[in-house]
Protein backbone atom coordinates (compact mmCIF):
# COMPACT_ATOMS: atom_id res chain seq x y z
CA UNK A 1 0.00 0.00 0.00
CA UNK A 2 2.80 2.37 0.89
CA UNK A 3 4.53 1.57 -2.40
CA UNK A 4 1.41 2.28 -4.41
CA UNK A 5 0.87 5.47 -2.42
CA UNK A 6 4.42 6.54 -3.10
CA UNK A 7 3.97 5.88 -6.81
CA UNK A 8 0.77 7.88 -6.83
CA UNK A 9 2.49 10.72 -4.96
CA UNK A 10 5.43 10.64 -7.36
CA UNK A 11 3.05 10.75 -10.29
CA UNK A 12 1.24 13.66 -8.72
CA UNK A 13 4.51 15.56 -8.27
CA UNK A 14 5.42 14.97 -11.91
CA UNK A 15 1.99 16.12 -13.05
CA UNK A 16 2.10 19.24 -10.88
CA UNK A 17 5.61 20.02 -12.11
CA UNK A 18 4.49 19.61 -15.71
CA UNK A 19 1.55 21.93 -15.11
CA UNK A 20 3.80 24.49 -13.48
CA UNK A 21 6.19 24.38 -16.41
CA UNK A 22 3.27 24.67 -18.81
CA UNK A 23 1.89 27.62 -16.88
CA UNK A 24 5.32 29.20 -16.86
CA UNK A 25 5.46 28.97 -20.63
CA UNK A 26 1.97 30.40 -20.92
CA UNK A 27 2.96 33.38 -18.79
CA UNK A 28 5.81 34.24 -21.08
CA UNK A 29 5.47 37.79 -22.50
CA UNK A 30 2.83 37.33 -25.17
CA UNK A 31 3.44 40.68 -26.82
CA UNK A 32 4.59 40.42 -30.39
CA UNK A 33 8.16 41.40 -31.20
CA UNK A 34 8.61 42.83 -34.69
CA UNK A 35 11.69 42.14 -36.81
CA UNK A 36 12.86 45.62 -35.85
CA UNK A 37 12.77 44.65 -32.16
CA UNK A 38 9.62 46.67 -31.45
CA UNK A 39 7.28 45.08 -28.90
CA UNK A 40 3.53 45.37 -29.48
CA UNK A 41 0.82 44.49 -26.96
CA UNK A 42 -1.31 43.00 -29.73
CA UNK A 43 0.04 41.14 -32.73
CA UNK A 44 -0.31 43.00 -36.01
CA UNK A 45 -1.49 46.24 -34.40
CA UNK A 46 0.01 49.43 -33.03
CA UNK A 47 -2.29 50.14 -30.09
CA UNK A 48 -2.47 53.85 -29.27
CA UNK A 49 -4.17 55.46 -26.27
CA UNK A 50 -5.83 58.85 -26.63
CA UNK A 51 -8.58 60.91 -25.01
CA UNK A 52 -11.50 62.06 -27.17
CA UNK A 53 -12.49 64.55 -28.29
CA UNK A 54 -9.48 66.81 -28.79
CA UNK A 55 -9.74 68.23 -32.31
CA UNK A 56 -7.83 68.85 -34.48
CA UNK A 57 -5.49 66.25 -32.97
CA UNK A 58 -8.00 63.46 -32.47
CA UNK A 59 -11.78 63.30 -32.73
CA UNK A 60 -14.49 61.23 -34.41
CA UNK A 61 -15.77 62.20 -37.84
CA UNK A 62 -19.42 61.95 -38.93
CA UNK A 63 -18.98 58.24 -39.55
CA UNK A 64 -17.50 57.56 -36.13
CA UNK A 65 -13.93 57.11 -37.35
CA UNK A 66 -11.20 58.67 -35.22
CA UNK A 67 -9.21 61.15 -37.30
CA UNK A 68 -6.87 64.07 -36.73
CA UNK A 69 -3.32 65.33 -36.74
CA UNK A 70 -1.97 62.87 -34.17
CA UNK A 71 -3.85 60.00 -35.79
CA UNK A 72 -2.29 60.58 -39.21
CA UNK A 73 1.23 60.90 -37.80
CA UNK A 74 0.87 57.66 -35.84
CA UNK A 75 -0.52 56.01 -38.97
CA UNK A 76 2.89 56.71 -40.51
CA UNK A 77 4.56 54.88 -37.62
CA UNK A 78 2.20 51.93 -38.00
CA UNK A 79 2.95 51.80 -41.72
CA UNK A 80 6.69 51.71 -41.03
CA UNK A 81 6.06 48.74 -38.72
CA UNK A 82 3.86 47.02 -41.29
CA UNK A 83 0.82 46.99 -38.99
CA UNK A 84 -2.47 48.86 -38.50
CA UNK A 85 -3.09 51.50 -35.85
CA UNK A 86 -5.77 50.70 -33.27
CA UNK A 87 -6.98 53.60 -31.11
CA UNK A 88 -8.25 53.28 -27.54
CA UNK A 89 -10.21 56.16 -26.03
CA UNK A 90 -9.34 56.41 -22.35
CA UNK A 91 -9.42 59.08 -19.59
CA UNK A 92 -6.50 61.49 -19.87
CA UNK A 93 -5.48 60.89 -16.25
CA UNK A 94 -4.49 57.31 -17.10
CA UNK A 95 -2.46 58.55 -20.05
CA UNK A 96 -0.54 61.36 -18.36
CA UNK A 97 0.19 59.25 -15.26
CA UNK A 98 1.78 56.52 -17.40
CA UNK A 99 -0.66 53.94 -16.02
CA UNK A 100 -2.11 52.94 -19.39
CA UNK A 101 1.37 52.33 -20.78
CA UNK A 102 2.63 50.50 -17.69
CA UNK A 103 -0.32 48.11 -17.60
CA UNK A 104 -0.01 47.21 -21.28
CA UNK A 105 -3.25 48.87 -22.29
CA UNK A 106 -1.46 50.42 -25.25
CA UNK A 107 1.92 50.62 -26.96
CA UNK A 108 2.01 54.40 -27.20
CA UNK A 109 0.04 57.49 -26.26
CA UNK A 110 -0.88 60.21 -28.75
CA UNK A 111 -3.14 62.75 -27.11
CA UNK A 112 -1.96 66.27 -27.89
CA UNK A 113 0.17 65.83 -24.78
CA UNK A 114 2.70 68.41 -23.64
CA UNK A 115 6.14 67.17 -22.62
CA UNK A 116 6.70 68.12 -18.97
CA UNK A 117 9.31 67.16 -16.37
CA UNK A 118 6.64 65.49 -14.25
CA UNK A 119 5.40 63.35 -17.13
CA UNK A 120 8.95 62.46 -18.19
CA UNK A 121 9.37 60.73 -14.84
CA UNK A 122 6.69 58.16 -15.69
CA UNK A 123 7.03 57.73 -19.46
CA UNK A 124 9.47 58.20 -22.32
CA UNK A 125 8.65 60.92 -24.84
CA UNK A 126 9.47 61.12 -28.52
CA UNK A 127 11.15 64.12 -30.06
CA UNK A 128 8.76 67.11 -29.98
CA UNK A 129 6.35 67.08 -32.91
CA UNK A 130 4.28 70.21 -32.27
CA UNK A 131 4.81 73.64 -30.69
CA UNK A 132 1.80 74.59 -28.57
CA UNK A 133 0.47 77.87 -27.15
CA UNK A 134 -2.27 78.38 -24.58
CA UNK A 135 -5.20 80.66 -25.43
CA UNK A 136 -8.26 82.26 -23.86
CA UNK A 137 -11.67 81.61 -25.43
CA UNK A 138 -14.63 83.92 -24.77
CA UNK A 139 -18.02 84.58 -26.31
CA UNK A 140 -17.92 87.24 -29.02
CA UNK A 141 -18.48 90.68 -27.53
CA UNK A 142 -17.32 89.83 -24.02
CA UNK A 143 -14.93 92.45 -22.55
CA UNK A 144 -12.27 90.00 -21.37
CA UNK A 145 -8.89 90.43 -23.08
CA UNK A 146 -6.56 89.06 -20.41
CA UNK A 147 -6.52 87.12 -17.16
CA UNK A 148 -6.53 90.44 -15.31
CA UNK A 149 -10.00 91.12 -16.70
CA UNK A 150 -11.30 87.91 -15.13
CA UNK A 151 -10.85 88.87 -11.49
CA UNK A 152 -13.64 87.29 -9.42
CA UNK A 153 -14.94 85.64 -12.61
CA UNK A 154 -15.25 81.96 -13.46
CA UNK A 155 -12.53 80.61 -15.75
CA UNK A 156 -12.96 77.12 -17.19
CA UNK A 157 -10.07 74.67 -17.45
CA UNK A 158 -9.74 71.04 -18.54
CA UNK A 159 -8.65 68.48 -15.95
CA UNK A 160 -5.04 67.22 -16.00
CA UNK A 161 -3.94 69.66 -18.73
CA UNK A 162 -1.13 72.19 -18.88
CA UNK A 163 -3.77 74.85 -19.53
CA UNK A 164 -5.17 74.11 -16.08
CA UNK A 165 -1.68 74.22 -14.59
CA UNK A 166 -1.02 77.58 -16.26
CA UNK A 167 -4.24 79.05 -14.87
CA UNK A 168 -3.46 77.75 -11.39
CA UNK A 169 -0.23 79.78 -11.35
CA UNK A 170 -2.28 82.97 -11.50
CA UNK A 171 -5.36 81.82 -9.57
CA UNK A 172 -4.60 83.73 -6.35
CA UNK A 173 -2.62 86.57 -7.89
CA UNK A 174 -5.39 87.54 -10.30
CA UNK A 175 -8.36 86.45 -8.22
CA UNK A 176 -9.54 83.78 -10.67
CA UNK A 177 -12.36 81.37 -9.90
CA UNK A 178 -11.28 78.17 -11.64
CA UNK A 179 -13.90 75.64 -12.68
CA UNK A 180 -12.51 72.28 -13.80
CA UNK A 181 -14.09 70.04 -16.45
CA UNK A 182 -13.25 66.43 -17.23
CA UNK A 183 -13.04 66.81 -21.01
CA UNK A 184 -12.89 69.38 -23.78
CA UNK A 185 -16.51 68.99 -24.89
CA UNK A 186 -17.75 69.88 -21.40
CA UNK A 187 -15.41 72.87 -21.26
CA UNK A 188 -16.65 74.17 -24.61
CA UNK A 189 -20.26 73.74 -23.53
CA UNK A 190 -19.59 75.66 -20.32
CA UNK A 191 -18.41 78.68 -22.31
CA UNK A 192 -21.36 78.40 -24.69
CA UNK A 193 -24.02 78.30 -21.97
CA UNK A 194 -22.39 80.92 -19.75
CA UNK A 195 -21.41 78.58 -16.94
CA UNK A 196 -17.95 80.18 -17.17
CA UNK A 197 -16.92 83.54 -18.61
CA UNK A 198 -13.88 82.18 -20.45
CA UNK A 199 -11.77 79.06 -20.86
CA UNK A 200 -8.10 78.22 -21.33
CA UNK A 201 -6.84 75.49 -23.63
CA UNK A 202 -4.37 74.99 -26.48
CA UNK A 203 -4.64 77.51 -29.32
CA UNK A 204 -5.09 74.93 -32.13
CA UNK A 205 -8.02 73.44 -30.21
CA UNK A 206 -9.78 76.81 -30.04
CA UNK A 207 -8.91 77.58 -33.66
CA UNK A 208 -10.64 74.36 -34.71
CA UNK A 209 -13.61 75.20 -32.48
CA UNK A 210 -13.97 78.63 -34.10
CA UNK A 211 -14.05 77.03 -37.55
CA UNK A 212 -17.02 74.91 -36.52
CA UNK A 213 -18.74 77.69 -34.56
CA UNK A 214 -18.15 80.87 -36.60
CA UNK A 215 -19.25 84.19 -35.16
CA UNK A 216 -20.13 83.08 -31.66
CA UNK A 217 -16.73 82.95 -30.03
CA UNK A 218 -13.26 84.49 -30.25
CA UNK A 219 -9.74 83.98 -28.96
CA UNK A 220 -9.23 86.95 -26.66
CA UNK A 221 -5.60 86.31 -25.71
CA UNK A 222 -2.68 83.97 -26.35
CA UNK A 223 -0.10 82.85 -23.81
CA UNK A 224 3.28 81.71 -25.14
CA UNK A 225 4.17 79.00 -22.65
CA UNK A 226 6.89 77.35 -24.75
CA UNK A 227 5.09 74.01 -24.69
CA UNK A 228 5.81 71.14 -27.08
CA UNK A 229 3.82 67.97 -27.71
CA UNK A 230 5.35 64.52 -27.75
CA UNK A 231 4.21 60.93 -28.28
CA UNK A 232 5.01 58.62 -25.38
CA UNK A 233 5.83 54.99 -24.63
CA UNK A 234 6.28 52.98 -21.43
CA UNK A 235 9.12 54.27 -19.25
CA UNK A 236 12.27 52.33 -20.19
CA UNK A 237 9.97 49.67 -21.62
CA UNK A 238 10.10 49.93 -25.40
CA UNK A 239 13.16 51.84 -26.65
CA UNK A 240 12.86 50.36 -30.13
CA UNK A 241 9.33 51.72 -30.58
CA UNK A 242 10.48 55.14 -29.37
CA UNK A 243 13.32 54.98 -31.88
CA UNK A 244 10.90 54.06 -34.68
CA UNK A 245 8.59 56.97 -33.79
CA UNK A 246 11.50 59.43 -33.87
CA UNK A 247 12.79 58.02 -37.15
CA UNK A 248 9.32 58.30 -38.69
CA UNK A 249 8.93 61.90 -37.51
CA UNK A 250 12.31 62.86 -38.94
CA UNK A 251 11.53 61.18 -42.26
CA UNK A 252 8.10 62.84 -42.49
CA UNK A 253 9.56 66.28 -41.83
CA UNK A 254 12.25 65.71 -44.43
CA UNK A 255 10.05 64.42 -47.26
CA UNK A 256 7.21 66.91 -46.78
CA UNK A 257 4.64 64.48 -45.39
CA UNK A 258 4.60 66.23 -42.00
CA UNK A 259 3.97 69.62 -43.63
CA UNK A 260 1.06 68.16 -45.61
CA UNK A 261 -0.54 66.73 -42.46
CA UNK A 262 0.08 70.00 -40.60
CA UNK A 263 -1.57 72.08 -43.32
CA UNK A 264 -4.55 69.71 -43.50
CA UNK A 265 -5.34 69.84 -39.79
CA UNK A 266 -3.74 73.02 -38.43
CA UNK A 267 -3.03 75.39 -41.31
CA UNK A 268 0.14 76.68 -42.87
CA UNK A 269 3.13 75.66 -40.81
CA UNK A 270 5.06 78.59 -39.25
CA UNK A 271 8.57 79.15 -40.55
CA UNK A 272 11.18 77.48 -38.41
Please give the residue ranges for each predicted region.
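C-terminal motif of bacterial Sec signal peptides marking the signal peptidase cleavage site
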Residues: 20-24
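Ligand-binding clefts/hinges and TM-proximal coupling segments of bilobed small-molecule sensing domains
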Residues: 27-36, 84, 164-179, 217-220, ...
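Extracytoplasmic small-molecule ligand-binding "clamshell" domains
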Residues: 32-111
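Periplasmic-binding protein-like
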Residues: 52, 130-138, 203, 207, ...
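Bilobed "Venus flytrap"/periplasmic-binding protein-like clamshell domains
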Residues: 52-55, 66-80, 113, 132-185, ...
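Extended ligand-binding regions for polar small-molecule ligands
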Residues: 71-80, 161-162, 231-270
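Acidic, polar ligand-binding/catalytic clefts
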Residues: 79, 84-149, 218
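A ligand-binding cleft/hinge motif common to bilobed small-molecule-binding domains
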Residues: 112-121, 168-169, 192, 197-225
Amino acid sequence: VRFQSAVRQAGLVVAVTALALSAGCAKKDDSEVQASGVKLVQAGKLTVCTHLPYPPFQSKDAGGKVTGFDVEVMDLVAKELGVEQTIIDTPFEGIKSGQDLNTGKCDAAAAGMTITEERQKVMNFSDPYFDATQALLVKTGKPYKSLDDLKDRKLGVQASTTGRDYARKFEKEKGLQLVEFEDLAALQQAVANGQVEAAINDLPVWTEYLKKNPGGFEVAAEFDTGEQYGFSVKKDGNPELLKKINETLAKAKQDGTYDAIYEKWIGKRPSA
